Amino acid sequence: MLRINCLATYGGKLYAGGDRGLPPPGERQWTGRPYRVYRFDGGTTWSVAGELPAERPRNCYPHAMAVHDGKLWVGYPNVWSFDGARWEFAGTPRGDTPEDQLPHLQVHSLEVYRGQLLAGMWPEARVVAHTGGENWVDRGRLGDGSEINALTVYNGMLYAGAIPRGEISRYDGVQTWTSLRKFFSPPG
């Protein structure tokens, strides 16, 4: 891998996900080759914990990770879960994303809040909640943002960080978000 996008501790082990690195000599791209999640085995040893599809409709480029309900969850643009032995497709966190935006859909963050796995999305800065199986429900959009890069729980409340305005918002329930600050607010 050239880039590590996500790390998580699951089952007492460290897991890492990222890109596929450089293509083999003579090839221009990695078309069709799976993405991998690696498990740290100690010292300098890592093993492949799983291979995720690179082709649509169930593709997954490990960009975000979270641990929830006894499983490791990995996302971008779709979400997969790992129970320590087997990987399972958990759907596409679409929410209310318009049909024309679906080819661009990406998971940029994962977090657990009030017993549900949440995904922070691009291109519309939506938060989408996993409701079981391959099902997801929209939890609202953050202002005029385009991407949710960070989700966290603080003092029992859910917070999200979005670009392009460096905005931090708090979830107030159902589909309501309150903007706490825009760190980048150019005129116009």
Language-model regions, residue ranges each:
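Trp- and S/T/G-rich repeat-edge/linker motifs of beta-rich repeat architectures
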Residues: 1-5, 9, 13, 22-61, ...
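Divalent metal-dependent phosphoesterase catalytic cores across multiple superfamilies
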Residues: 18
